[in-house]
């Protein structure tokens, strides 16, 4: 597998929107940086080779959150079993924005050494569901038996985030955090790494970084792992991009595992108007590069080997979603994203875009009138008008469509709700739209039958889980 190289077009030169940048390596600012091992994501189709959904949206391209195919007979959803969470500080419960369960089909020899129940150990092709909760716990379920596969990990602080597991098969869990305090307790905040043989935390990387220019420290986005160099990659609300050379040591015969991370961070300041530090969304990755946007609306392609921006552009409004990438047979690589009204207290056009991931050029922008209605009360609570959910890259019968869920849209009759838009990947023209009756920040999930028939599953702020026809909406 050979990934293409990226190089900025004239319109996407980093110096046009970035005022300065810096790299922290070994705890010190350095003038130049080069990773000790080549960090390159490799074939994205092999990320989930062991089976399952191992990170937010399935893999480094962040295209979907499903694995395998489905057989649909009745086109209805039903609850098989519900699992209750507890309540933390009489405030936090359930699963927050950006919280997606993982599904891990463990290798048999790994499963047998872990502290899961005997019933789950004996389940053929056992699939474990792992989901952190805002009640301060990380839950583990057996997807087949619908029972707990092992005890919850108790952190005691809100972790309504999406975790990730090591794609190489190592029994490692990487978990961020969205808050550091309750009314009675202030703890640590950052990235936790757990040994899933015994569920013990074996490393903690703080996000209270002296070099950070942002005022918040949450690590809400899900990390990804580049297996070749054993590198963990993630962003934080403090405005930094982190890479951790994990130096994992796994003794299969003795069932022991350890890590010895070396942290590197990339930060920057912007020259655009109203620049503010903060990263809400996570990274997508292709080849040597990671792609992410910030709360100002600066979208960057950063080389993981040099920790320098290859290209950067200003979207004009906040980018709060994790972008999606798509590779094409001719070598083209494209990025899909959208904006949210996080900078301005007004109503404005929401931008839905396709961008050349190798140059930073805008390929198209949706021309449909999508007016987001800014609401200060909702924004203060972290819910913004626009694209907070990650787009769904269509496959099967909808392989020509890109699906966006846009929150808090003002319709022609002045009513406000989320709207799902299906756009043509080539032109950006609207193929169909489906207004919901409430707001929604849920990233749509694509389900496909063997014949390519498509369905979309997504939730909303009213607590409804919807099944939609992917072809017609």
What does each model-found stretch correspond to?
Residues 1-42, 46, 63-219, 224-473:
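Extracytoplasmic/lumenal domain signature
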Residues 53:
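Short glycine/Trp-rich loop-beta-loop segment that forms part of the substrate-binding cleft
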Residues 56:
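Segments forming glycine/polar-rich beta-alpha architectures that bind adenosine-containing cofactors
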Residues 59-60:
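Acidic glycine-/aspartate-rich tracts in secreted/extracellular proteins
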């Amino acid at each position: 597998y050979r990934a293409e190289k990226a190089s900025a077009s004239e319109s996407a030169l980093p110096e046009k929107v970035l005022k300065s940048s810096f790299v922290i390596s070994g705890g010190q600012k350095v003038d130049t940086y080069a990773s000790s091992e080549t960090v390159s994501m490799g074939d994205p189709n092999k990320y989930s080779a062991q089976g399952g959904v191992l990170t937010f949206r399935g893999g480094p391209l962040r295209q979907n959150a499903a694995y395998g195919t489905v057989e649909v007979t009745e086109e209805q959803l039903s609850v098989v079993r519900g699992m209750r969470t507890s309540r933390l500080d009489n405030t936090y419960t359930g699963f927050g924005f950006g919280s997606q369960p993982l599904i891990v089909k463990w290798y048999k020899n790994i499963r047998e050494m872990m502290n899961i129940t005997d019933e789950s150990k004996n389940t053929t092709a056992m699939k474990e569901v792992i989901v952190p909760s805002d009640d301060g716990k990380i839950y583990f379920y057996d997807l087949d038996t619908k029972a707990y596969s092992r005890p919850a990990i108790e952190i005691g602080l809100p972790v309504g985030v999406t975790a990730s597991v090591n794609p190489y098969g190592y029994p490692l869990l990487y978990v961020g955090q969205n808050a550091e305090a309750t009314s009675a307790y202030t703890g640590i905040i950052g990235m936790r790494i757990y040994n899933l043989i015994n569920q013990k935390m074996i490393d903690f990387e703080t996000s209270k970084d002296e070099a950070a220019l942002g005022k918040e420290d949450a690590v809400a986005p899900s990390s990804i792992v580049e297996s070749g160099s054993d590198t963990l990659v993630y962003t934080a609300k403090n405005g930094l991009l982190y890479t951790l050379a994990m130096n994992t040591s796994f003794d299969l015969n003795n069932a022991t595992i350890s890590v010895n991370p070396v942290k590197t961070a990339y930060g920057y300041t912007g020259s655009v108007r109203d620049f503010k530090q903060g990263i809400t969304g996570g990274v997508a990755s292709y080849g040597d590069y990671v792609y992410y946007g910030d709360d100002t609306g600066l979208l960057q392609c950063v080389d993981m080997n040099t920790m320098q921006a290859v290209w950067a552009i200003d979207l004009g409004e906040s980018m709060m979603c994790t972008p999606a990438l798509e590779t094409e047979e001719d070598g083209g690589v494209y990025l899909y994203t959208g904006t949210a009204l996080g900078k301005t207290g007004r109503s404005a056009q929401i931008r839905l875009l396709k961008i050349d991931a190798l140059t930073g050029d805008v390929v198209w922008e949706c021309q449909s009138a999508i007016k987001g209605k800014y609401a200060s009360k909702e924004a203060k609570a972290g819910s913004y008008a626009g694209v907070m959910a990650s787009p769904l890259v269509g496959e099967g019968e909808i392989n020509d469509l890109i699906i966006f869920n846009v929150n808090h849209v003002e319709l022609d009759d002045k009513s406000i709700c989320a709207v799902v838009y299906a756009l043509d990947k080539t032109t950006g023209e609207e193929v169909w739209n489906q207004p919901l009756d409430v707001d929604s920040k849920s990233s749509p999930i694509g389900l496909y039958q063997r014949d390519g028939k498509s369905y979309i599953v997504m939730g909303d702020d009213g607590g409804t889980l919807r099944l939609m026809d992917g072809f017609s909406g």
